[in-house]
UniProtKB/Swiss-Prot annotation:
Motif (YXDD): 195-198
Motif (LPQG): 161-164
Name under which the protein is recorded: Endogenous retrovirus group K member 25 Pol protein
Catalytic activity: DNA(n) + a 2'-deoxyribonucleoside 5'-triphosphate = DNA(n+1) + diphosphate; Endonucleolytic cleavage to 5'-phosphomonoester
Gene of this entry: ERVK-25
Miscellaneous information on this protein: This protein is synthesized as Gag-Pro and Gag-Pro-Pol polyprotein precursors. These polyproteins are thought, by similarity with type-B retroviruses, to be generated by -1 frameshifts occurring at the Gag-Pro and Pro-Pol genes boundaries.
Length: 954
């Protein structure tokens, strides 16, 4: 009956007769009960808890419970002396699926039309009037303990939204929003703001406002909600969401900032968060709070000590003054909004106005993402940010944007600035530079550093040109009319070069050329840039000094970048090299001195204090200083093994997507190109040994391994490991990866295959890094067949099967040392290279294919070829397909030859069968003499040669 009477009353008031909204169920991550034990409570608090629980039980907010869930409960005493019950729901919140916020920000009261009458109401105990879904009630159970456990504890569970539940605000907003929806539909010309349980209604006339409020009362009651009668506001000044609202003006509510509680980072973080929240109303520019923001720097521990500096104290006083005096205006709904951009110090300031009435302030963050942010880019970013804010406030773009730039500067910004193009994308309003005549903005501290005045984008005519350089040894230098070397405390080449640039930025026209792109970009941008604070004090000092130096100049300058260590001709490269020489490291100086004087290793070590290994490497890799070394290879030739497991190359590459296992150790057999790779957490000797043991299990044990000069490969532990397995070890040229070209190419091939599998593969079961590697290796070794091959790498590795049609053929090969052409036999042929047997008692020679010619092809006069370097035989006419991939295959004859050499047995009969050479007297003939065809069955030419056979065929 009561419900029927209530519905009749609501109908009489004119509201729609609808059922109250149904409870909104929660989504749970788990149905496993969460039980957190109740802690003991003092007797006084326990008595207060019993009273509060009985009160809630009478109101129907809780009910007795036998739930397997439990959350601790406690009470606090208010200033008025009353007690308040709270539930610790942190454990329960952890298993609730968040609903997400429905109102991510506070509504702006400035959008309330000016001079419209208002009514503001507050819903009474809003959470306690919204029911929980029946199935969710048991999850919010709590226990009231008994002293000394002398009786069973009393247990209850919430039937309404509990305070502190993760989704209570969202459910409350949804519930109240549904109740207000009929009001919004019927009174669409009224302006209604609803935030949690606070509701503001505005209408053009008082009569319409009363009608709207009457209907709203009925709808709220119909939804089971209650209005707090003591919190209804009907006259100015209104207080809503921390603001004092008058007929036309809006002011922040008067507050006092307590400074005695500011002792730790957390205290200052909260204070600045609150100040930032009301800054759009206060209008405090970013530069006026820089000292307060600086206090947040340093240790990120919330309890770390912080102190209020005198400068920051002044800024807090400014905030308090602004709170007392600042005000913004309610808008005219029929007039458009405009955006003014002021070029204030530190960063620009935006102001949203309507006519000359201030609506809201807009600021950029104090800290930036980039180290240098150009002032023009900051203006563009602020425009884009404030345009979005205006659209959010009223649903429209501003009618006009006023910027501190001329029309020509605006035109250039559209052409040259990507940030400007983004900030003003799709803007169809007016861009102007005429500010309204009003005194309310005159307090702003403006800057003149908007666009560059000193820095030029084009070289200066008739100006001095200076080259700068820096080194990690702390030396900086510049060259020009005079040279100078400057000692700096920095261990960074870029920082040392910054010192050189600052030094040469004297007050006269100058063109600066630097080989550091970092320094060039910093110097170009620093004039108008906001410099991001860095924890590195040295870097801060350098950048600030650079900016001050540039801004103090009276004459323009130009700076550009030049690539270092190139062999390009011209005076720029020469002059830059001269500057580089002034600061080059000990190793570079040692290499340059040896190239000039060919001093021995001991002399290099003594003069430059380099290690013995580095000194010996410099000498050993000098072609003029080699006295007794293994034969050097021709340019473009990377030695291969002549049979499986003869020579491996090994390296470490990085695959970032593997996470901790990003160090991928790669081994490739240079004969078969069989690849094996394993992923590890590092590249130390222990990781290398683990990788090699894996390789031995798959590929076998090699005779020789070639690596770079990494610490993991040069350690004593690794050498001992190799000696145990009877493996010889060589390294490439220090700091030069060309000696390991095969494995470097393999790294790229492997990474490409991994990318293909990741982006286009269907093998979702390959979840771990090693599984992904294994799939890639299986494809490369057992499935792929490369051009000019007939078998896979796995078949070649396991069987040693021949794979090139040119193996065993007679060829002419060019001896670059003697400038002569010799005859030989192909042992193996790959992409751009070949291994040739030059004759008896001689080791095989690796030669680029451009220095080869098949034996049955026409040849020019041997005498002329010997005497005139320009008259060489035609280059090999081998199809380019024969030079693919560089895979090598052995012949049985070469195997015999190698085995004999390895055993130091000298020349054997079998070795003679494959080691041959045209006699010396043939060299002088225009055409080699012809002899009868050889009749021996084992003739190396198959008995078909028109020339004489030597050695065992003679």
């Amino acid at each position: 009956n009561k419900s029927k009477k209530r519905r009749n009353r609501v109908s009489f008031l004119g509201a729609a007769t609808v059922e109250p909204p149904k409870p909104i169920p929660l989504t749970w991550k788990t149905e496993k009960p969460v039980w957190v034990n109740q802690w003991p409570l003092p007797k006084q608090k326990l008595e207060a808890l019993h009273l509060l629980a009985n009160e809630q039980l009478e109101k129907g907010h809780i009910e007795p419970s036998f739930s397997p869930w439990n959350s601790p409960v406690f009470v606090i005493q208010k200033k008025s002396g009353k007690w308040r019950m709270l539930t610790d729901l942190r454990a329960v919140n952890a298993v609730i699926q968040p609903m997400g916020p429905l109102q991510p920000g506070l509504p702006s009261p400035a959008m309330i039309p000016k001079d419209w009458p208002l009514i503001i109401i507050d819903l009474k105990d809003c959470f306690f009037t919204i029911p929980l879904a029946e199935q969710d009630c048991e999850k919010f159970a709590f226990t009231i303990p008994a002293i000394n456990n002398k009786e069973p504890a009393t247990r209850f569970q919430w039937k309404v939204l509990p305070q502190g539940m993760l989704n209570s605000p969202t459910i409350c907003q949804t519930f109240v929003g549904r109740a207000l929806q009929p009001v919004r539909e019927k009174f669409s010309d009224c302006y209604i703001i609803h935030y949690i349980d606070d509701i503001l209604c505005a209408a053009e006339t008082k009569d319409k406002l009363i009608d709207c409020y009457t209907f709203l009362q009925a709808e709220v009651a119909n939804a089971g909600l209650a209005i707090a009668s003591d919190k209804i506001q009907t006259s100015t000044p209104f207080h809503y969401l921390g603001m004092q609202i008058e007929n036309r003006k809006i002011k922040p509510q008067k507050i006092e900032i307590r400074k005695d509680t500011l002792k730790a980072l957390n205290d200052f973080q909260k204070l600045l968060g609150d100040i930032n929240w009301i800054r759009p109303t206060l209008g405090i520019p970013t530069y006026a709070m820089s000292n307060l923001f600086s206090i947040l720097r340093g240790d990120s521990d919330l309890n770390s000590k912080r102190m209020l500096t005198p400068e920051a104290t002044k800024e807090i006083k400014l905030v308090e003054e602004k709170i007392q005096s600042a005000q913004i205006n309610r808008i005219d709904p029929l007039a458009p909004l405009q955006l003014l951009i002021f070029a204030t110090a530190h960063s620009p300031t935006g102001i949203i106005i309507q006519n000359t009435d201030l609506v809201e302030w807009s600021f950029l963050p104090h800290s930036t993402v980039k180290t240098f942010t150009l002032y023009l880019d900051q203006i563009a970013t602020l425009i884009g940010q404030t345009r979005l804010r205006i659209i959010k406030l009223c649903g429209n773009d501003p009618d006009k944007i006023v910027v501190p730039l001329t029309k020509e500067q605006v035109r250039q910004a559209f052409i040259n600035s990507g940030a400007w193009q983004i900030g003003l994308a799709n803007f169809v309003g007016i861009i102007d530079n005429h500010y309204p005549k009003t005194k309310i903005f005159q307090f702003l501290k403006l800057t003149t550093w908007i666009l560059p005045k000193i820095t030029r984008r084009e070289p200066l005519e008739n100006a001095l040109t200076v080259f700068t350089d820096g080194s990690s040894n702390g030396k900086a230098a510049y060259t020009g009319p005079k040279e100078r070397v400057i000692k700096t405390p920095y261990q960074s080449a870029q920082r040392a070069e910054l010192v050189a640039v600052i030094t040469v930025l004297q007050d006269f026209d100058i063109n600066i050329i630097s080989d550091s792109a970092y320094v060039v970009q910093a110097t170009r941008d620093v004039e108008t840039a906001l410099i991001k604070y860095s924890m590195d004090d040295q870097l801060n000092q350098l950048f600030n000094l650079l900016q001050q130096t540039v801004r103090k100049r009276n004459f323009p300058f130009y700076i550009t970048h030049i690539r270092a260590h190139t062999n390009l001709p011209g005076p720029l490269t020469k002059a830059n090299k001269q500057a580089d020489l002034l600061v080059s490291s000990a190793l570079i100086k040692a290499q340059e001195l040896h190239a000039l004087t060919h001093v021995n290793a001991a002399g290099l070590k003594n003069k430059f204090d380099v290690t013995w290994k580095l000194a010996k490497d410099i000498v050993q890799h000098c072609t003029q200083c080699q006295v007794l070394h293994l034969p050097t290879q021709e340019a473009g030739v990377n030695p291969r093994g002549l049979c499986p497991n003869a020579l491996w190359q090994m390296d470490v590459t990085h695959v970032p997507s593997f996470g901790r296992l990003s160090y991928v150790h790669v081994t490739v057999d240079t004969y078969s190109h069989f690849i094996w790779a394993t992923c590890h957490t590092g590249e130390s000797t222990s990781h290398v040994k683990k990788h090699l043991l894996s390789c031995f299990a798959v590929m076998g044990v090699p005779e020789k391994i070639k690596t770079d000069n990494g610490p993991g490969y040069c350690s004593k532990a690794f050498q001992k490991f190799l000696s145990q397995w009877k493996i010889s070890h060589t390294t490439g040229i220090p700091y030069n990866s060309q000696g390991q070209a095969i494995v470097e190419r393999t790294n790229r091939t492997l990474k490409t295959q991994l990318v293909k599998q990741k982006e286009g593969g269907d093998s979702k079961e390959c979840t771990t890094p090693q599984m992904q590697l294994n799939l890639a290796l299986y494809t490369l070794n057992f499935l792929n067949i490369y051009r000019n091959q007939t078998t896979t790498s796995a078949e070649q590795h396991l069987t040693g099967k021949k794979n090139s049609p040119h193996e065993g053929k007679l060829i002419w090969w060019k001896d670059n040392k003697n400038k002569t052409w010799e005859i030989g036999k192909v042992i193996t042929w790959g992409r751009g290279f070949a291994c040739v047997s030059p004759g008896e008692n001689q080791l095989p020679v690796w030669i680029p294919t451009r220095h080869l010619k098949f034996y049955n092809e026409p040849i020019r006069d041997a005498k002329k070829s010997t005497s005139a370097e320009t008259e060489t035989p035609q280059s090999s006419t081998v199809d380019s397909q024969d030079e693919q991939n560089g895979d090598v295959r052995r012949t049985d004859e070469v195997a015999i030859h190698q085995e004999g050499r390895a055993a130091n047995l000298g020349t054997t009969k079998e070795a003679d069968a494959v080691s041959y050479k045209i006699s010396r007297e043939h060299k002088g003939d225009t055409n080699p003499r012809e002899y009868a065809a050889c009749s021996l069955d084992d003739c190396i030419n198959g008995g078909k040669s028109p020339y004489a056979c030597r050695s065992s065929c003679s």
